[in-house]
């Protein structure tokens, strides 16, 4: 079953081209709008000009849970807080809470991604899901796919 034919049936070369374009835009955004990522990239001697395809992902630094905690609460945001429409946070049981902010575009992307996943494993609009979860942010993200999933 196919959710988004234009993406899911795209030839490999076209898909990699889209991935490369979006990857480069993301790197440019975080480099220019997030001091944390700019510093991490500069420490590695990497600039957005060094990122030309999805294959260049190996040039970029990792982001760890400690990075998220050390920049608590919003030090890694690449957009103004006025664009954040939803915030998810861990309980902080093992340290500072891990906070992630989402824009409307982020939530739409999650919905699209999860709708594709539900469709790929055969779910249809007449199926019933039970998703039992804690309130960790990855679990809450699944709600967006479930809420927007209407038909296969």
Regions found by a protein language model. Give the residues of each.
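Conserved AMP-binding loop of ANL adenylate-forming enzymes
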Residues: 115-151
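Nucleotide 5′-phosphate-binding alpha/beta core
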Residues: 1-89, 94-112, 116-120, 124-126
